Design a protein with these regions (language model features):
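Core residues of bacterial helix-turn-helix
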Residues: 12, 30, 41-42, 70-71
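A short, Lys/Arg-rich alpha-helix, primarily the initiator
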Residues: 3-29
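DNA major-groove recognition helix of helix-turn-helix/homeodomain DNA-binding modules
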Residues: 62-77
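Short amphipathic recognition helices of helix-turn-helix/homeodomain-type DNA-binding modules
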Residues: 40, 77-80
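Residues within the helices of the helix-turn-helix
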Residues: 24, 35, 65
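Short alpha-helical DNA-recognition segment
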Residues: 31-51
Length: 80
């Protein structure tokens, strides 16, 4: 019988910050503002992109794939 294991909230701040820095680097290389990238992602508010770039939010893989597509890069390029 399976043991009852408490699930910890996975969050690796160092990796989130490293991914965020890469998002910022590629966004700036494409000469996009945070607001423009957010709009392309379907968000009405640029603050989500701002929080991602600073490593303040945990986001899902689908959102990361969307950002990579918009920035015209491989998703691997965003990984630390």
């Amino acid at each position: 019988m399976a043991k009852n294991i408490k699930r910890k909230n996975f969050r690796n701040d160092n990796q989130l910050k490293a991914i965020g820095e890469k998002i910022r680097k590629f966004r700036l290389a494409k000469e996009l503002t945070q607001a423009e990238l957010a709009f392309e992602c379907g968000d009405k508010d640029w603050s989500q992109i701002s929080r991602m770039e600073r490593g303040l939010v945990n986001f899902n893989i689908s959102y990361l794939l969307l950002i990579a597509e918009i920035l015209e890069i491989s998703p691997k390029e965003l990984l630390p």
